[in-house]
């Protein structure tokens, strides 16, 4: 692209500036080929002519578009050069207060000189697990990337932190280690991560000091390796140190301090344990007062000293060793304050023996005072022949003293580092490590010495490694994207490194000069000039012979050679060291032992083949004989540096470059000169240059398409392949193919191409804007013209109207005057006429009144005479009538008396006649015959019993004879003893016999009572069946009455449909009746098998109980019931009562089925009400049809029951035959065939009597019903009961007592029917109300569906289809669940009945065995009737009994192995109810051990299940609901009145009686809290990966968000259709899943509200925290997306009726943040509006969002710094917390409100799927 295209008018450029380094300017005219200068306008409107040289490429740098300014990654800039980098850093640092910025793989960190709230635990958790490009730049992001790559690639990592002093290296390294300690906590209880963090305050105390540039400057370099195991938990650490600045111990520059530990120890000198140190304030010691100021503003040395001691204790340093360390440090201070006196000759010195500091020094180190006093002032010279002791001058003594002090401190420093490594050492196997390197950055001062030389040498090595790594990454990126690449030329500093470390390099020559006896710094400098004068990286200064210049990668540095040799030798006199070795303190002697070198060095390299952390000494282990042969400092540093580079090359490096913004330590003050100097020195610009040499700008096809689709043509957009679209667009826009490359997933651009595309995009928008403005202005002018024209027409219209109205007014006035005159004349004439007329009328009225009064008086007189005549005639007529009536009455009385006497006489004669008696006797013939038959039967039975008695008597006689014989035999042997024994035995037998008789009487009384109760129960069942019959008839009549007004055609169709449904319902009902009959028959068969005998009914038993024609209980069934009652008396009360319980349960099942039919009938009634009304004729036809259908239905059902009854009888007879055959076989083996045949005969006779009784019942019922009808229809029947009654059977008169009894029964029946009718009317009214409620519910459902339909219409077609499918799935799922529940219910009943059948079959077998045993026993004993102990059958009391050995099985089946799916369709929280019923039985039996064991096992089992399924939401919610319900049950039935207010009387019976389980309730409450927290944790774990993508990144409103370049750090979700991409519907679906599970499990609604409140808080916290940490998310479009997403979540809450949970209130900070992104941010009023609106956001959060606010296009504006300052000023009064991020781990305290259950324990049924057959219902 030519310069004329780039440098056009309005193009902005950068030009050099001496003050600001670079300055922005704008072209005022286009550049043309051949121009020698550019016309520029500066920002202050100054015009400047800037010279250019196009041939030599001397043109100003182009400025990036504003849309790219402030980017997180410098490589995202289109124009990559120094001014662009500097400006971007400045804007982010000053305007947005962002101290971190990416530059490719480098994190640039600018020291803010202010504590920022961005390093808390919440920020660590926010960055944990995130990709490096997903969040704003941060040191935590680099640490997370290293941690993630270590786990993913299984390769060691390293973080290299560099920068000059005061740039923040140590703080950055400390935060990185804190991140690793938090995220990768130790796997055991060793708390190794705390020890790693504890090493920081120790190293800062002994290795950091205050300098002019930094108050906490690290004066050494360190490399910390943090070891991890296979699970990536911290297991240990190791530290290596480099180049401690020992000279600071004895010398500090002005306004600097010594190491912190000296001042900390002086600040704590007043403590009792430090009295022996003899310390005072720091100003009193020479080594601490050198710099002048001994304090640091804002730092408390005493508090820091306490932190140092705590850290030493945590690392395992004993108190004795700590005291020894502090003694050594104090001795150094005393040594520096020793006063040295010079002698007169000047060649010798002396120290006063009374010197207090020297005494303290010797006593603290445990050495001899005299020896140290002597050798501080003397030295030993050793020659080949002899040894000399020589005095030293004052300067030599001072130097020797300072060298000793430095050496002591260096040795102590090395010992502490070694001890820290031992404390951080671990025996576990190390899998990988992450190293953190904190080392000096490049340094250049006015005077540079040996320390700066070593530091810059290390930075040269690090820069070389950095360059090669960056180059390698660039090549890998190009190869991965499959684009051609050429070798990128980058700066290689290997020649400079060779100059320093190669053979005969600077360090070799320095070591060689140190070995020369009289070597000097000047000689060494001369050797350098001679050897390296031709090197391009070495220069000799012009004005000096003792300095040299090295051309480093960052800058040229001039080093002064003075002191190089001495610092490299690091000489300490051996005599002084020997004195220290002889110390009486072990620690002091150990510091200077022979196997340790005197010079400090770094740790040696670890064995790389071993995976463990090897702790080795920081000094070489080579024993040297004397000081001349020890290794120099330069050699040691070079060796340790090479080992460090080997370590770094074996790891994946991550770079952090720390920048110092200014030298004054001012917060958020940016000095461009200092910043540029450091950017050049740290290699950031080199990174930019390497990136710019290739393809620095990289876009995915998806992002490029979204950003630049405005540049595409319509025909290009028809292509579905975005990749081809991007290729065709780029080829048309950028002509030079070398300016871009198409990769596999990305498009690569040369530098400046993105800016060119942005310019084209802006031009496109500008053209569109002009077009829009043109159209709008034209429209406005047209509107203005139309408005003016309309106004003109309106004025004309009003003027013309005014003139017309004035003319009309004149005409109206003229006409009015004429009318007025006419009316006045007419009025005058009318008044005269009225006067004459009025006088005439008055005269006429008076005359007419006189004549009228005269006529009235005459009429009045005539009327009075007529009244007198009327009353006289009436009196005469009444007198005549009374006389005639009295005479007629006398005649009637006489005649009636005569007729009555005649009739009485005839009746008396008839009563005495024989014919009447015959007629009376005919009615009794049947009864006489029946009584005769009964007498015959009784005679037969008596005969049979007599035979049995004779047989028994004969057998008894035989036994008596046998006994007599035995008695005679016994008498012969033992006459006296035997007689006594027999008498006693007879007496005991008699006693037992009497006792048995008394028990029999008691049992007979109980039997009679139970028999009465059973009869009463049967009567109740008949009554209930009658109610159901009447209700059915009433409903049928009501259905017919309500369909009177239906239309003819629709009525016929609806009636046919309803009839069909009715027939189906009837068929289903008949099938159920049939099933009931079959089950009843089975019961009868089993009962007959158990019955050993049968007793006949009494003949006079009343049979009115069976007077019913109800379909559910027929006459045959009543007969069966009577049989059952008789069998109760025969087979034993206990067994019969158990069987009758089954019968009553079956009757209960029939009632349930009848209720179900009733519900179906109600639904049928509703359907018929909705049908249209028909005509009267067809209505009558429909009525007849329904009545016929009902009659047919009743007859069909009656016939079916009769046939079923016959079938049952046949089956019963066959079963009896089979039993008889079996019994015959069994009895033949027992030699007793007669007894069982006798029982069969009795059974046969009982059946015959039963048939006779049935016929009598039918005859009597027919007579009663006909008599009742006759009585109601008769008109002449007299109420006298003594009169002759005409019965239906006139030939056979019925007894008077029977008739009276029948009459009373009919009256009672009528009253019962009236009561039923009233009850049915009430039930009908309730049913109508229920139907109305259903109609209202259906209306609400229809409204909701209409709303849903309206919302669906707003969605896209694909979304509509998906929504429709979801709705259909939900509907089908609900129907499926209903059907499943019905099927399971029926299966459960079937299984239950089968199980009972098996149980009774087993009981029958046991009974037969017992009877056989009893028969064998009766052979040897006297014949007595078997008496069974009665057990009164009770209802289920809601208790479950189990054996102690079944407790483990109960817990396994009910808790540990239970799956929630097994209980779908049953009562919610069923396990809780079952457990309580077990607890209740244990309480009932007062078994405290059983209660304790069961509760403990239950709690432990629940914990075990939750531990096993710690990530299963359904299982956790299932046990949360069951635990809460169990807790509620323990409260509800505890007996505490406070919990029993809502109980029913039945529930109060189920309360615990013996135990107070308050403590267990507390344990269950705690367990519920734990389960709730686990539930929240699981739900958060499922939701958290979706939140950021769904709430911030996904485009809920399509096309709203824009795309901006992201640079080297690509966002993980920027790729289209990414694996981790979620939409809002995913969250809603997950929420629906949660809500469905919680509701299905029966969890309390209050807890459900709390769950979703917690989840919505988590959504709010995670979203807001990400918003606060992501610059790309803070835009107007993101605010719109957020508001839409929040509204959708609120709508979901309302739809689920969860809006009262407070979840919306928890979202308030996020709502306000979204509103803040959309509000206007310019004026003072805007600031006030923001402050009043954002009440839930803290000041820091508001300012952070405003700083992060980023426009997505050129037409938006950034938030100005002044506006942010205004916001801060207005929010100063707020007392907000200092925390920036919300605590996403915060959990609201959960409340479990008391929620009693409405269910009673006896209504709970246990499904067979639980396999709890061992539980017995009590």
UniProtKB/Swiss-Prot annotation:
Actin-binding: region residues: 641-663
Binding site for ATP: 163-170
One MF annotation (Gene Ontology) recorded for this entry: ATP binding
Domain spans labelled Myosin N-terminal SH3-like: 8-60
Location of Phosphoserine modifications: 1416
One CC-aspect GO term: myosin complex
Keywords annotated in UniProt: Actin-binding, ATP-binding, Calmodulin-binding, Coiled coil, Cytoplasm, Motor protein, Myosin, Nucleotide-binding, Phosphoprotein, Protein transport, Repeat, Transport
Residue stretches of biased makeup (Polar residues): 1098-1118
Domain of life: Eukaryota
Region (Requires for interaction with LIMA1): 21-40
Location of the protein in the cell: Cytoplasm
Job description of the protein: May be involved in vesicular trafficking via its association with the CART complex. The CART complex is necessary for efficient transferrin receptor recycling but not for EGFR degradation. Required in a complex with RAB11A and RAB11FIP2 for the transport of NPC1L1 to the plasma membrane. Together with RAB11A participates in CFTR trafficking to the plasma membrane and TF (transferrin) recycling in nonpolarized cells. Together with RAB11A and RAB8A participates in epithelial cell polarization. Together with RAB25 regulates transcytosis.
Subunit annotation: Component of the CART complex, at least composed of ACTN4, HGS/HRS, MYO5B and TRIM3. Interacts with RAB11FIP2. Interacts with RAB11A and RAB8A. Found in a complex with CFTR and RAB11A. Interacts with NPC1L1. Interacts with LIMA1.
Name of the molecule in the record: Unconventional myosin-Vb
Native organism: Mus musculus (Mouse)
Gene that specifies this protein: Myo5b
């Amino acid at each position: 692209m030519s310069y004329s295209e780039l440098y056009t008018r309005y193009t902005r450029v950068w030009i050099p500036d001496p003050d600001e380094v670079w300055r922005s300017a704008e072209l005022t005219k286009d550049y043309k080929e051949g121009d020698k200068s550019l016309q520029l306008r500066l920002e202050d409107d100054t015009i400047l002519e800037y010279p250019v040289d196009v041939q030599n490429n001397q043109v100003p740098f182009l400025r990036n578009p504003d849309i790219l300014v402030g980017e997180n990654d410098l490589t995202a800039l289109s124009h990559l050069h120094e001014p662009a980098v500097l400006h971007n850093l400045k804007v982010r640092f000053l305007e947005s207060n962002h101290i971190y910025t990416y530059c490719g793989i480098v994190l640039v960190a600018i020291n803010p000189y202010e504590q920022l709230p961005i390093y808390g635990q919440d920020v660590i958790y926010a960055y944990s697990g995130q990709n490096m490009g997903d969040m704003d730049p941060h040191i935590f992001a680099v640490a997370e990337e290293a941690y993630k790559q270590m786990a993913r690639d299984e390769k060691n990592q390293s973080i290299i932190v560099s920068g000059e002093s005061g740039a923040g290296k140590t703080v950055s390294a400390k935060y990185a280690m804190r991140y690793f300690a938090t995220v990768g906590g130790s796997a055991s209880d060793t708390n190794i991560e705390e020890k790693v963090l504890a090493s920081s305050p120790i190293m800062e105390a002994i290795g950091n000091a205050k300098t002019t540039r930094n108050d906490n400057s690290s004066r050494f370099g360190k490399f910390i390796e943090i070891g991890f195991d296979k699970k990536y938990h911290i297991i240990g650490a190791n530290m290596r140190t480099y180049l401690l600045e020992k000279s600071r111990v004895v010398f500090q520059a002005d306004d600097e301090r010594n190491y912190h530990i000296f001042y900390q120890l002086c600040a704590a000198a007043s403590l009792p344990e430090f009295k022996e140190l003899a310390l005072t304030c720091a100003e009193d010691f020479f080594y601490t007062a050198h710099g002048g100021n001994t304090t640091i503003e804002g730092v408390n040395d005493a508090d820091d000293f306490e932190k140092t001691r705590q850290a030493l204790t945590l690392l395992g340093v004993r108190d004795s060793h700590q005291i020894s360390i502090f003694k050594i440090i104090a001795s150094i201070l005393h040594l520096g304050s020793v006063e040295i006196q010079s002698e007169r000759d000047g060649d010798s010195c002396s120290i006063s023996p009374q010197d207090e500091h020297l005494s303290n020094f010797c006593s603290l180190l445990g050495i001899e005072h005299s020896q140290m006093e002597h050798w501080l002032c003397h030295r030993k010279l050793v020659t080949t022949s002899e040894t000399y002791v020589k005095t030293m001058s004052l300067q030599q003594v001072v130097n020797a003293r300072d060298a000793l002090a430095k050496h002591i401190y260096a040795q102590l420093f090395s010992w502490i580092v070694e001890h820290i490594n031992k404390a951080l050492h671990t025996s576990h196997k190390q899998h990988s490590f992450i190293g953190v390197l904190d080392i000096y950055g490049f340094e250049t001062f006015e005077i540079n010495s040996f320390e700066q030389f070593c530091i810059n040498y290390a930075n040269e090595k690090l820069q070389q490694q950095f360059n090669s790594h960056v180059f390698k990454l660039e090549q890998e990126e190009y190869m991965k994207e499959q684009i051609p690449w050429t070798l990128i030329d980058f700066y290689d500093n290997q020649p400079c490194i060779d100059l320093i470390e190669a053979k005969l390099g600077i360090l070799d020559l320095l070591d060689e000069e140190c070995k020369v006896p009289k070597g000097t710094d000047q000689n060494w400098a001369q050797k350098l000039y001679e050897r390296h004068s031709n090197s391009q990286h070495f220069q000799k200064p012009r004005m000096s012979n003792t300095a040299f210049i090295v051309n480093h990668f960052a800058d040229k540095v001039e080093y002064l050679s003075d002191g190089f040799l001495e610092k490299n030798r690091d000489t300490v006199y051996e005599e002084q060291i020997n004195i220290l070795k002889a110390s009486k303190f072990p620690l002091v002697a150990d510091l200077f032992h022979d196997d340790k070198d005197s010079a400090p060095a770094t740790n040696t390299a670890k064995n790389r083949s071993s995976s463990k952390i090897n702790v080795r000494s920081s000094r070489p282990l080579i024993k040297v004989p004397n000081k001349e042969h020890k290794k120099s400092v330069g050699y040691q540093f070079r060796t340790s540096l090479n080992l460090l580079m080997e370590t770094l090359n074996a790891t994946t490096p991550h770079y952090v470059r720390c920048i110092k913004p200014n030298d004054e330590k001012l917060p958020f003050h940016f000095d461009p000169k200092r910043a540029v100097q450091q950017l050049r020195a740290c290699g950031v610009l080199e990174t930019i240059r390497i990136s710019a040499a290739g393809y620095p700008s990289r876009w995915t096809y998806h992002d490029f398409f979204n950003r630049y689709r405005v540049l595409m043509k319509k025909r290009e957009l028809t292509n579905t392949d975005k990749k081809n679209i991007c290729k065709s667009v780029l080829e048309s826009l950028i002509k030079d193919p070398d300016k871009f490359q198409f990769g596999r997933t990305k498009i690569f651009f040369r530098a400046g191409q993105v800016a060119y595309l942005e310019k084209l995009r802006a031009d496109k928008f500008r053209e569109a804007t002009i077009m829009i403005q043109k159209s709008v202005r034209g429209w406005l002018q047209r509107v203005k013209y139309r408005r003016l024209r309309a106004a003109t027409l309106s004025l004309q219209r009003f003027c013309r109207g005014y003139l017309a109205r004035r003319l009309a007014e004149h005409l109206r006035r003229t006409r009015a005057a004429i009318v007025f005159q006419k009316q006045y004349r007419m009025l005058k004439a009318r008044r005269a006429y009225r006067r004459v007329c009025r006088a005439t009328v008055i005269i006429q009225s008076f005359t007419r009144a006189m004549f009228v009064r005269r006529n009235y008086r005459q009429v009045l007189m005539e009327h009075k005479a007529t009244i007198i005549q009327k009353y006289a005639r009436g009196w005469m007529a009444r007198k005549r009538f009374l006389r005639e009536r009295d005479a007629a009455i006398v005649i009637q009385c006489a005649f009636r008396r005569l007729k009555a006497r005649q009739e009485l006489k005839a009746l008396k004669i008839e009563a005495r006649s024989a014919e009447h008696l015959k007629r009376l006797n005919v009615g009794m013939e049947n009864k006489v015959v029946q009584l005769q038959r009964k007498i015959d039967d009784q005679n037969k039975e008596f005969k049979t019993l007599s035979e049995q008695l004779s047989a028994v008597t004969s057998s008894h006689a035989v036994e008596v004879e046998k006994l007599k014989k035995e008695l005679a035999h016994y008498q012969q042997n033992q006459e006296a003893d035997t007689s006594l024994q027999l008498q006693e035995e007879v007496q005991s037998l008699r006693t037992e016999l009497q006792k048995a008789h008394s028990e029999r009487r008691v049992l007979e009384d109980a039997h009679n009572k139970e028999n009465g109760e059973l009869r009463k129960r049967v009567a109740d069942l008949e009554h209930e069946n009658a109610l159901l019959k009447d209700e059915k008839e009433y409903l049928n009549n009501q259905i017919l009455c309500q369909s009177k007004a239906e239309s003819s055609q629709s009525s016929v169709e609806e009636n046919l449909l309803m009839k069909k449904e009715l027939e189906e319902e009837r068929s289903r009902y008949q099938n159920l009746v049939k099933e009931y009959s079959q089950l009843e028959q089975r019961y009868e068969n089993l009962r007959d098998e158990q019955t050993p005998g049968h007793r006949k009914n009494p003949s006079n038993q009343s049979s009115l109980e069976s007077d019913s024609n109800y379909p559910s209980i027929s006459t045959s069934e009543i007969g069966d019931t009577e049989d059952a009652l008789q069998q109760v008396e025969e087979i034993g009360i206990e067994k019969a009562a158990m069987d009758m319980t089954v019968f009553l349960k079956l009757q209960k099942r029939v009632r349930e089925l009848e209720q179900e039919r009733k519900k179906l009938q109600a639904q049928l009634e509703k359907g018929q009400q909705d049908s249209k009304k028909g005509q009267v004729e067809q209505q009558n036809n429909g009525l007849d049809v329904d009545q016929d259908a009902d009659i047919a239905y009743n007859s069909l059902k009656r016939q079916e029951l009769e046939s079923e009854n016959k079938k049952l009888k046949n089956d019963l007879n066959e079963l009896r035959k089979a039993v008889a055959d079996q019994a015959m076989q069994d009895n033949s083996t027992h030699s007793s065939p007669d007894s069982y045949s006798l029982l069969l005969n009795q059974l046969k006779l009982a059946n015959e009597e039963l048939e006779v009784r049935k016929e009598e019942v039918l005859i009597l019922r027919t007579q009663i019903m006909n008599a009742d009808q006759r009585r109601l229809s008769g008109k002449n029947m007299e109420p006298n009961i003594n009169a002759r009654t005409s019965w239906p059977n006139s030939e056979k008169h019925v007894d008077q007592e029977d008739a009276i009894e029948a009459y009373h029964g009919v009256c009672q029946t009528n009253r019962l029917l009236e009561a039923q009718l009233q009850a049915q009317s009430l039930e009908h009214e309730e049913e109508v109300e229920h139907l109305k409620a259903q109609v209202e519910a259906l209306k609400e459902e229809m409204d909701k569906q209409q709303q849903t339909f309206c919302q669906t219409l707003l969605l896209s077609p694909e979304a509509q289809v998906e929504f429709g499918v979801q709705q259909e799935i939900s509907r089908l799922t609900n129907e499926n669940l209903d059907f499943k529940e019905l099927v399971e219910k029926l299966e459960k009943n079937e299984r239950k009945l089968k199980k009972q059948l098996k149980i009774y079959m087993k009981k029958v077998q046991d009974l037969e065995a017992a009877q056989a045993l009893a028969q064998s026993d009766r052979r040897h004993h006297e014949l007595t009737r078997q008496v069974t102990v009665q057990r009164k059958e009770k209802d289920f009391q809601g208790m479950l009994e189990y054996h102690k050995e079944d407790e483990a099985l109960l817990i396994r089946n009910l808790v540990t192995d239970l799956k929630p799916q097994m209980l779908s369709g049953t009562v919610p929280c069923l396990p809780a109810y079952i457990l309580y019923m077990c607890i209740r039985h244990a309480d009932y039996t007062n078994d405290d051990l059983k209660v304790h064991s069961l509760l403990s096992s239950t709690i432990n089992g629940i914990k075990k299940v939750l531990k096993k399924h710690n990530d299963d939401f359904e299982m956790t919610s299932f046990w949360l609901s069951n635990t809460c319900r169990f807790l509620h049950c323990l409260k509800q039935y505890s007996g505490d009145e406070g919990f029993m207010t809502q109980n029913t009387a039945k529930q109060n019976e189920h309360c615990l009686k013996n135990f107070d389980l308050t403590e267990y309730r507390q344990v269950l409450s705690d367990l519920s809290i734990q389960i709730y927290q686990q539930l929240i944790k699981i739900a958060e774990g499922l939701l958290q990966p979706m939140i950021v993508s769904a709430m911030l990144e996904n485009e809920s409103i399509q096309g709203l968000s824009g795309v901006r370049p992201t640079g080297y750090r690509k966002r993980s979700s920027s790729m289209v259709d990414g694996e981790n991409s979620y939409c809002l519907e995913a969250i809603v679906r997950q929420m629906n899943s949660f809500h469905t599970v919680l509701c299905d499990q029966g969890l309390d609604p209050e807890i459900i509200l709390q769950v979703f409140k917690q989840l919505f808080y988590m959504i709010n916290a995670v979203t807001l925290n990400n918003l606060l940490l992501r610059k790309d998310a803070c835009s107007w479009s993101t605010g719109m997306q957020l508001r839409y997403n929040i509204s959708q979540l609120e709508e979901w809450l309302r739809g689920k009726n969860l809006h009262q949970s407070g979840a919306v209130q928890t979202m308030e900070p996020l709502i306000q943040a979204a509103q803040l992104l959309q509000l206007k941010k310019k004026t003072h009023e805007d600031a006030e509006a923001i402050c009043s609106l954002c009440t839930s956001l803290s000041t820091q959060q508001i300012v952070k969002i405003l700083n992060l606010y980023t426009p997505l296009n050129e037409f938006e504006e950034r938030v100005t710094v002044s506006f942010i300052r205004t916001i801060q000023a207005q929010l100063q009064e707020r007392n907000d917390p200092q925390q920036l991020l919300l605590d996403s781990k915060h959990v609201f305290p959960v409340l479990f409100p008391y929620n009693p259950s409405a269910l009673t324990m006896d209504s709970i049924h246990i499904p067979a799927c639980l396999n709890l057959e061992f539980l017995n219902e009590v």
